Design a protein with these regions (language model features):
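Bacterial signal peptide processing site
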Residues: 21-23
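C-terminal motif of bacterial Sec signal peptides marking the signal peptidase cleavage site
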Residues: 16-19
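Acidic, His- and aromatic-enriched active-site or binding-groove loops in soluble protein domains
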Residues: 45, 79-80, 192-219
């Protein structure tokens, strides 16, 4: 009796602060409906979650690409087939994470699945007769002619989609990349025949260097004087992940090859030559925000 009187008194004393009920001698706070107010106060410290667009090819035909991307552990936000319809297929809502990027990074960001939109384009990648070309060791990398062309309608679909995404999410030009750019140790897509330069010139999509700047940096003496660590730092300045060894080992050459696939696709060799160096310097002058070029 005394215990119940004490509990009732405790509830009465605390009632101004919380509602009080008793169930089996247990004190419980009443729950009330609360309103989420998202208008009265607004924070300025915020940005879009989507920071980049990653372009892929599927290395498969339409049917297999659809099956792989809708039933397996790999997915993408968008799929562009190689047929003649007028559709771009949205497989994963943009608000959700698709499993398309995997391990790698670009522009200081890793786990790009969390911060990117993935676009898969149906394309075989390497022509069937060249798929085993690297196995005998005669070649380290596939040259331009080994890659499969993209369909014209596919490129127009890519252009429309990427323009829209880049505008809606305020994605910077240099963060519109290929899978190879963020994972050069294991990926080469969308390959040498993806028309990065055309997309830049005709649709204003992605990054490209100024020819005048490239010619300025085509200086053999400056190239010869540049150390390997300095050149690797230039790759990092643009956004590529590359090791800090003082040799052009296979991992480093993979980065060079990925860079060439994007910015010098007609001659992707994996070798750091004068033209590749000049293009890298020109890109950094234009996009990396550095002011020590002249």
């Amino acid at each position: 009796m005394a215990k119940n009187i004490f509990l009732a008194l405790a509830c009465a004393l605390t009632l101004p602060l919380i509602g009080c009920v008793t169930t089996n001698n247990t004190q419980i706070a009443n729950t009330e409906p609360f309103v989420i107010d998202s208008e009265t106060y607004q924070a300025t410290g915020k940005s879009e979650r989507i920071k980049s667009i990653v372009l892929h090819y599927t290395v498969s035909d339409n049917a297999r690409s659809i099956k792989t991307l809708t039933t397996g552990n790999v997915s993408a936000h968008y799929l562009i087939l190689d047929n003649n319809d007028n559709k771009i297929y949205n497989l994963v809502p943009e608000s959700e994470r698709a499993w398309h990027a995997g391990n790698g990074g670009f522009a200081g960001r890793t786990i790009l699945n969390d911060t990117s939109i993935g676009i898969e384009i149906v394309n075989a990648g390497i022509k069937p007769e060249y798929r085993d070309a690297l196995k005998n060791g005669a070649l380290d990398y596939h040259p331009y002619e080994h890659y499969v062309e993209f369909d014209e309608l596919q490129i127009k679909k890519v252009a429309q989609l990427v323009q829209d995404l880049a505008k809606r999410y305020s994605i910077s030009a240099k963060n519109i990349i290929g899978h190879a750019d963020m994972a050069p140790s294991r990926k080469i897509d969308p390959g040498a025949k993806f028309p990065w330069q055309r997309l830049y010139k005709e649709y204003g999509i992605g990054a490209w260097y100024n020819e005048f700047d490239k010619q300025f940096f085509m200086n053999q003496d400056a190239f010869a004087a540049a150390t390997i660590p300095e050149i690797k730092q230039a790759f990092r300045d643009y956004g590529y992940q590359i090791n800090d060894t003082d040799v052009w080992d296979k991992a480093s050459r993979n980065v060079v090859y990925a860079f060439q696939l994007h910015f010098r696709p007609q001659q992707p060799t994996g070798e750091l030559d004068l033209e590749t160096y000049a293009i890298l310097k020109a890109l950094n002058k234009k996009y990396a925000g550095r002011d020590d070029f002249y």
